């Protein structure tokens, strides 16, 4: 990534003439990294697709609750499924996601991305099955079990974020030199965004099979159970995923210097955390309560099919923003694509908020404006936050910094969900959109000052810069680059014992470490 605040630090603090541990980045060699065998290319493709696909589970979890909130009220009544219970069940997944993102982000740096992805998959499958099996001697007891199981699903979903996105990005880095951003968006945010409308499609199918409102309990249990299949369908392919050269050479196996990393990347981290908070504060409650919003502008608020159909149209239109962001990210850069998306919140949030009383009388027009707001949200922060956060730091700390950014976003989600109903009840429905516009403005300001402008660059270049920064500040630990050098030296000694000139070979090995292998 191109970032003056980091390269300037590197130029000032790194003096390769005085520190023998300084390594050089060989741009020419790395430019040919995509010229591999068909087998290696296929491995990268499988890793990219398999890593990102199960993120559909996050969209499915949110989208399914949007419709099931209506089902629970109709089946068990507002007394058993009050707004307080609804918020608790919804927030359980959010709290779980926060734990999963943070702790799996740390684990992804210390252990392999592959092992963490497999753990995330298993948690998702088990959690979804237990949601479907929620039971209690009383209805409130059943909802308490559902709350706990939704939290478990949330842990699995949260674990997916750092492990899947980082694995897909690092594999895409080895697959292409010019289109990594667009590829990452299409394999991660597309399934994530499509999960919502896909959940609505599944709901409509199950609703029809279960004879409508006659078997509401069967509907919600079936919808939850089907959530098991999305992560399970790619488990085998995830088992076969490959570990990239970027990860092997850029990782630190023990005693990661987090203080130095924070000192090096604080500005970027502030940018990704702040923008993700603003985005999730708006988009998450809008996703969960979209059926509530839609039902408030149609005549028959208990017509589940009508609500679901409008919800599906809204979701499908919003998904169209994903390829727009994928196209722009590799052309105008991540930063300006992010700002473009936030501007949609300002424009359409103000239009809907200021003209809410008029628009709610014209349901199709209301849905179109609402969809445009969500579409630009997907094109900007929805697409770019995962990309920026997964390439804003070196491999050694990429997991934990991505996790911190995503966790901050989910904290924004929790705050947004908690504030959504009180805002509607006390200020009026229009203010949910006006506040979205305010968040869009704040998002643009944070992006402008704290998010670096970048197009494509090799992730390993950033690893080299970070390595050199660490050693120039007295760090004595080992990165993958250093371990590669030690292995080369061992091979040199073995060659010497067989009668080969050691000094000549040793000089060649040092040159390889400093240039070719970096």
UniProtKB/Swiss-Prot annotation:
Q: What happens when the gene is disrupted?
A: Impairs the uptake of glycerophosphoinositol (GroPIns). Also impairs the uptake of glycerophosphocholine (GroPCho).
Q: Which residues are glycosylated?
A: 80
Question: Which Gene3D superfamilies did the record assign?
Answer: MFS general substrate transporter like domains
GO BP, one annotated term: glycerol-3-phosphate transmembrane transport
Q: Which residues lie on this side of the membrane: Extracellular?
A: 66-91, 137-138, 206-216, 290-306, 357-360, 421-430
Give the membrane topology, semicolon-separated if more than one: Multi-pass membrane protein
The primary location reported for this protein is membrane
Is the keyword Transmembrane in the record?
A: yes
SUPFAM superfamilies cross-referenced by the UniProt entry: MFS general substrate transporter
Entries under CDD domains matching the protein: MFS_PhT
Catalytic activity line of the entry = sn-glycerol 3-phosphocholine(out) = sn-glycerol 3-phosphocholine(in); sn-glycero-3-phospho-1D-myo-inositol(out) = sn-glycero-3-phospho-1D-myo-inositol(in)
**Superkingdom of the source species:** Eukaryota
Write down the InterPro entries for this protein, in alphabetical order: MFS_dom (IPR020846), MFS_sugar_transport-like (IPR005828), MFS_trans_sf (IPR036259), Sugar_transporter_CS (IPR005829)
Entry's transmembrane regions: 45-65, 92-112, 115-136, 139-159, 185-205, 217-237, 269-289, 307-327, 336-356, 361-381, 400-420, 431-451
Cytoplasmic compartment spans? 1-44, 113-114, 160-184, 238-268, 328-335, 382-399, 452-518
Induction comment: Both inositol and phosphate regulate GIT1 transcription and expression is positively regulated by the transcription factor PHO4.
Listed GO CC annotations: cell periphery; fungal-type vacuole; plasma membrane
One term of GO molecular function? glycerol-3-phosphate transmembrane transporter activity
Compartments, record wording: Cell membrane
**What is the similarity comment for this entry?**
Belongs to the major facilitator superfamily. Sugar transporter (TC 2.A.1.1) family.
What the protein does? Glycerophosphodiester transporter that mediates uptake of both glycerophosphoinositol (GroPIns) and glycerophosphocholine (GroPCho) as sources of the nutrients inositol and phosphate.
Q: Which protein are we looking at?
A: Glycerophosphoinositol transporter 1
> Which gene is transcribed and translated to give this protein?
GIT1
């Amino acid at each position: 990534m191109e970032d003056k605040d980091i390269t300037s630090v590197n130029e000032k603090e790194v003096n390769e003439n005085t520190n023998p541990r300084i390594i050089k980045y060989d741009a020419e060699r790395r430019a040919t990294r995509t010229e591999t065998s068909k087998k290696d290319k296929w491995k990268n493709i499988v890793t990219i697709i398999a890593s990102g696909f199960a993120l559909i589970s996050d969209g499915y979890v949110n989208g399914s609750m949007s419709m099931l909130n209506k089902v629970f009220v109709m089946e068990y009544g507002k007394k058993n499924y009050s707004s307080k219970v609804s918020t608790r069940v919804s927030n359980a997944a959010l709290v779980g996601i926060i734990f999963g993102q943070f702790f799996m982000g740390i684990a992804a740096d210390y252990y392999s991305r592959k092992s963490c992805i497999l753990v995330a998959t298993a948690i998702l499958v088990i959690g979804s099955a237990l949601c479907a099996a929620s039971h209690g001697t009383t209805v409130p007891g059943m909802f308490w079990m559902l709350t706990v199981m939704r939290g478990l699903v949330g842990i699995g979903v949260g674990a997916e974020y750092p492990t899947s996105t980082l694995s897909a990005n690092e594999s895409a880095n080895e697959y292409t030199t010019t289109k990594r951003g667009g590829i990452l968006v299409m394999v991660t945010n597309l399934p994530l965004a499509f999960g919502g409308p896909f959940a609505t499609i599944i709901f409509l199918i199950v609703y029809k099979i279960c004879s409508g409102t006659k078997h509401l309990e069967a509907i919600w249990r079936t919808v939850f159970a089907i959530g098991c299949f999305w992560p399970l369908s790619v488990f085998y392919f995830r088992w076969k995923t490959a570990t990239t050269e970027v990860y092997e050479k850029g990782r630190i196996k023990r005693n990661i210097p987090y203080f130095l990393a924070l000192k090096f990347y604080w500005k970027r981290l502030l940018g990704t955390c702040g923008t993700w908070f603003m985005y999730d504060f708006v988009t998450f409650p809008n996703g969960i309560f979209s059926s509530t919003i839609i039902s408030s502008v149609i005549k028959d608020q208990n017509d589940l099919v009508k609500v679901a159909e409008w919800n599906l149209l809204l979701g499908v239109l919003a998904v169209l923003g994903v390829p727009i962001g994928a196209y722009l990210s590799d052309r105008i850069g991540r930063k300006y694509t992010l700002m473009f998306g936030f501007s949609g919140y300002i424009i359409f949030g103000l239009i809907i908020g200021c003209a809410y009383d008029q628009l709610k009388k014209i349901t199709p027009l209301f849905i179109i404006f609402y969809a445009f707001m969500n579409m630009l949200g997907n094109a900007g922060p929805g697409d770019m936050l995962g990309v920026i956060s997964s390439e804003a730091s070196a491999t050694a700390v990429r997991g934990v910094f991505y996790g911190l950014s995503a966790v901050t976003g989910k904290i924004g989600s929790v705050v947004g969900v908690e504030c959504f109903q009180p805002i509607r009840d006390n200020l009026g429905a229009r203010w949910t959109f006006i506040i979205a516009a305010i968040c869009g403005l704040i998002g643009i300001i944070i992006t402008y000052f704290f998010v670096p402008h970048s197009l494509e660059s090799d992730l390993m270049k950033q690893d080299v810069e970070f390595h050199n920064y660490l050693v120039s500040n007295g760090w004595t630990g080992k990165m993958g680059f250093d371990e590669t050098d030690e292995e080369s030296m061992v091979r040199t000694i073995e060659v010497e014992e067989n009668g080969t000139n050691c000094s000549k070979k040793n000089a060649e090995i040092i040159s390889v470490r400093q240039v070719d292998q970096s």
